[in-house]
Amino acid sequence: MTTDHRTTALLLFSAFVAVTLIITTWVSRHRQGSAEEFYTGNRLFSPMENGFAIAGDYMSAASFLGISGLIALVGYDGMLYSVGFLVAWLVVLFLVAELVRNCGRFTLADVVAARMRERPVRIAAGTSSVAVSVLYLVAQMVGAGSLVALLLGGTGEAVQAWTVVGVGALMVIYVSLGGMRATTWIQIVKAVLLLGGTITLTVLVLLRFHGDVNRLLHTAAERSGHGDAFLAPGLAYGGDWTARFDFISLGLALVLGTAGLPHILSRFYTVPTARAARRSVVWAIGLIGGFYLMTIVLGFGAAALIGPDAVRASHASGNTAVPLLALDLGGGAGTTGGTVLFAVVAAVAFATILAVVAGITLASSASVAHDLYASLRRSGGKPRSEVAVARVAAVGIGIVAIALGLLARDLNVAFLVGLAFAVAASANLPVLLYSLFWRGFTTRGAVWSVYGGLIPAVVLVLLSPVVSGSPDSLFPGVDFQLFPLQNPGLVSIPLGFLAGWLGTVTSTEVPDEARHAETEVRSLTGAGAA
């Protein structure tokens, strides 16, 4: 792009940041002193508003940039992410949404601790929630670095590094000043912008091929260099048995992980009733379903119009496929139309990243303040306000996410989110389901379930090809790879469920029938819910 066009792009790109900071500043003038206000916005959002906010929270950089990029590079196999992310919401709708809204108050640990000894359960669940959130944040940081480096016309490490630092600083400002109310409105605005941008690009791609989807697919296959194999399963996950098991592992993580994501669970506390929570999910499924169908068109459109080689040359993992597609659809590099469309898409993608990191940071800082701090602080001293602790925690989590984002900047963002989903499905989902549905579940079972899924998931990732042993690893110069799969879900998810069962059957604790009955009635009817 020319200097003038880059200036235009940067002005459009900066507009959303300005709008979101105005929203945050306006909200910060309202009283944010109570935990209820800071964590849930006083539960004043309607099902439609919360549905748009959930969609805004869920349609992350992994969805917009990563999935389309993977489809552009590996075709059919990249669609697994689109299908997995969408199907996961059926688990949320039928098993989690209403029950979590009725049983909890602010965090996942509230649901589990309702019938267990609070301290060990809150420490375990809080630790797990922070681990999942940080992994998810890293993916958003990587997406931001790739996007802004492309926007500025450079792919140097310094540009990406400063972008990651800038995103981290913005997310801390959003959460510290605005809390849930500002975060929710940022997510709603972002969801509208993202859907509008995605619809526009999808229509332009289909118009380029005169509405002939068959022609679009065959053109993508021809330019891919793989022929019809580009449109069939197996290009990425069918080479050998290890790849096939990786396929199964990733599918399990995507389908089961959503119900264990802390920032998604926290959204159910922002509506007044369980019925509103369920209606929120219905709204979210409609919005998210339409979006993921369009990412498939964008992925194959990038393969057909840009070509996998050009996408890979811009970013090895395909994270810049959609911005490059927008540039081409608008008229190409050097044209005003191409630059404006590119800048709009870049601004929308950046809005996506900012909104998601704000939601994740709020959820993880809530876990630190409401679960970890409240459980670990020494008695006798003057306790600090939960909200004050949450604001400090947001800063600490931001620093950790920035550091890891700098380390992982060359990985595909959809792939990174797949790892976060695997940890969520391994550590959070088993304890959540056992707490809601198993009458005999005990405190030991809850603690073992969390750590029995969390520790294996993290250790297997560290020992996988993601970290070492291959040219695409985080540390390509060393090799301590012992686990062959890139996603640990196939092993760590069953281990989480097994550990919860084993901890319960070996526990000498007698399950509290009265508290279980109370939790069951509350989860099903909403009686006594906050």
Regions found by a protein language model. Give the residues of each.
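Loop-to-helix junctions at membrane interfaces in multi-pass transport proteins
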Residues: 2-6, 42-45, 66-80, 159-160, ...
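A generic transmembrane alpha-helix motif of multi-pass inner-membrane proteins
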Residues: 2-24, 246, 444-530
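Alpha-helical transmembrane segments
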Residues: 5-18, 81-92, 244-253, 347-354, ...
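Membrane-interface loop-to-helix entry segments
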Residues: 5-36, 106-149, 162-222, 256-263, ...
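Structural signal for membrane-spanning alpha-helices in multi-pass inner-membrane proteins
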Residues: 20-27, 92-96, 171, 175, ...
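Short, Lys/Arg-enriched, Gly/Pro-containing loop segments at transmembrane-helix junctions
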Residues: 32-38, 110, 213-218, 414-417, ...
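Helix-loop-helix junctions that connect adjacent transmembrane helices in secondary transporters/permeases
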Residues: 67-177, 267-418, 527-530
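Hydrophobic cores of alpha-helical transmembrane segments in multi-pass inner/ER membrane proteins
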Residues: 87-94, 427-432, 436, 492-503
